[in-house]
Amino acid sequence: MLSLGLFVRLEARPGKEKDVAAFLMQGLQLANQEPTTPLLFALRLGPSTFAVFDAFHDESGRQTHLDGSIAKALMAYAPDLLAVPPSIEKTEILGSKVSQEVRTAA
């Protein structure tokens, strides 16, 4: 069961919204190579506000993700892409329902 998560809020610098969206799609490709990250949603919350929600089976998987290539890339590109440092919140999943694959936006 997926029991732990991460909610990462990102605020793009003015004019960098498309770059942040592209970065998130590249991150999705990297996450597909992480066996300890079974669920990831890249989200747009508003014109310049984005988020990522990841879910994990255990703390080891979550920590592996936090120590992995996506997090390192985010911290490397954050000064150029983001208006403020990313907000990273550890979450506990109380319940879930995922019945089909979600398609990515065009």
Which residues are covered by each model-predicted region?
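An amphipathic, aromatic/His-enriched active-site/gating alpha helix that lines ligand/cofactor pockets
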Residues: Q26-L39, A55-K90
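Glycine-rich beta-strand-turn "strand-cap" elements at beta-sheet edges
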Residues: M1-L4, P38-T49, L74-A106
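Intrinsically disordered, low-complexity acidic/polar segments
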Residues: E17-D19, G61, K97
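Short, surface-exposed ligand-recognition loops at beta-strand->loop->(often short) alpha-helix junctions
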Residues: R9-A21
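Non-catalytic surface loops within mature trypsin-like serine protease
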Residues: A12-P14, D58, E92-G95
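Short, well-ordered beta-strand segments in beta-rich or mixed alpha/beta enzyme
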Residues: G5-L10, L39-S69, T104-A105
